[in-house]
UniProtKB/Swiss-Prot annotation:
Zinc fingers (C2H2-type), renumbered ranges: 241-263
Protein name (Swiss-Prot/TrEMBL): Transcriptional regulator STP4
Region listing for Disordered, in residue ranges: 25-58, 89-122, 137-210
Molecular-function GO terms, alphabetical: zinc ion binding
GO annotation, cellular component aspect: nucleus
Length: 376
């Protein structure tokens, strides 16, 4: 077998030199004739190499460089990454139909970290030495966001890959320019809107301007309603609104209308009157009361001079304060919470409201003189 490896006539070994042949040649040596030997005998002696553990080490194989073998898979994988960027820049939904070998798991130490270049006709991405090239980084993850243009610079590519590798980026960010500027949705919500503007109450208060005050010629004071103030300087006989019963003058018509109600007793009008049910208004009714009570000296328990009220609230306040008896020490705000009794008939009730609705308004009290008109 050794003679066959040295013989040049073997075309297979001359065409495909192997490492085994070089390995065998290192252990071959030509012995020159010693001075003691005869000069006519020259022999070629080959020393055998050390025994290898591989039993088939003597078999010669063709060189791997001379065979038509495609490139390593990691180069094809880099080529596939470049094709993905190319298809992504051209806005194609699917990558190009380029044939490539199936991907193999290659240790990260065999991959060049600083000289990896992704070349493309429209975009170029360079991996710096500080960037990680471990298989955990998903550099070729599918991208669903559209891009505005295909011309990307090195900084834009690096920012794009950093966004893909860090999923903690907020989803509220949107890409609006080739430089991948981020704009939050909160800024869009607070943008001023020209249409359908609503003026707040504060703006109305700011736009509101007070009325200009005018100076009174008599007292030299300033008033916003000078006409109403001038009526206070008028004498009772010179005021514009005069009562036809007592010829008393009033500055405003409301004051005159309130004053006329006091004369309704004299004119005998029942319009708008609220009469106290326990007040003797005329002498005829007083005589009837004397017959009922049998005592002419009984007071009417009314401190009002006429017993006629022009307002309903003052009429009810008069009844609750004068004609209903509360427990000793009852305060005004506690009147609706305590029980009491009618001062005239001494009948007990739960509270003053119960006495008003079920005793006074129904004219149930036997000592009531004036009947209360029921509202229909």
């Amino acid at each position: 077998m050794l003679s066959m490896a040295v013989t040049p006539s073997n075309t297979l070994t001359s065409q495909y030199p192997t490492k085994q042949e070089n390995y065998n040649q290192n252990y071959c040596s030509i012995k020159s004739p010693s001075p003691t030997s005869t000069p006519t005998s020259t022999s070629l002696t080959m020393t055998s190499p050390p025994q290898l553990h591989n039993p088939h080490a003597s078999i010669t194989l063709p060189s791997i460089h001379s065979l038509d073998i495609p490139a390593f898979p990691h180069y094809e994988q880099e080529y596939s990454r470049a094709s993905v960027f190319q298809n992504y820049s051209s806005n194609s939904p699917t990558p190009s139909n380029s044939s490539y070998s199936p991907t193999l798991l290659i240790p990260s130490n065999d991959r060049p970290a600083s000289s990896s270049v992704y070349s493309n006709s429209s975009s170029t991405l360079l991996l710096s030495p500080g960037m990680s090239t471990t298989p955990n980084v998903n550099c070729i993850a599918p991208v669903s966001r559209p891009r505005s243009t295909s011309n990307l610079t090195e900084n834009s590519e690096q920012s794009f890959t950093s966004q893909q590798s860090h999923p903690a980026i907020s989803s509220n960010a949107t890409i609006t320019s080739p430089q991948l500027s981020v704009k939050s949705e909160n800024e869009q919500l607070h943008e001023p809107q020209n249409s359908n503007t609503i003026i707040s109450p504060r703006q109305n208060k700011k736009n509101w301007k007070p009325r200009k005050k005018k100076q009174c010629p008599e007292c030299n004071l300033y008033f916003s309603n000078l006409a109403t103030h001038k009526s206070t300087h008028l004498k009772p006989n010179n005021r514009p609104h005069i009562c036809k019963y007592c010829e008393r003058g009033f500055a405003r018509p409301n004051d005159l209308f309130r004053h006329v109600k006091c004369h309704w007793k004299e004119i005998g009008s029942d319009q708008g009157q609220f009469k106290c049910p326990f007040k003797n208004i005329d002498s005829s009714k007083r005589e009837n009361q004397e017959k009922v009570t049998g005592n002419t000296g009984v007071p009417d328990h009314c401190c009002h001079n006429t017993g006629i009220f022009s307002r309903c609230d003052t009429f009810k306040n008069h009844l609750k304060a004068i004609h209903f008896q509360y427990p000793n020490g009852t305060k005004k705000e506690q009147r609706n919470l305590v029980n009491g009794k009618c001062r005239m008939c001494q009948q007990e009730f739960r509270n003053v409201d119960d006495w008003m609705h079920n005793h006074i308004e129904t004219n149930s009290c036997p000592y009531a003189i004036n009947l209360i008109k029921k509202e229909h």
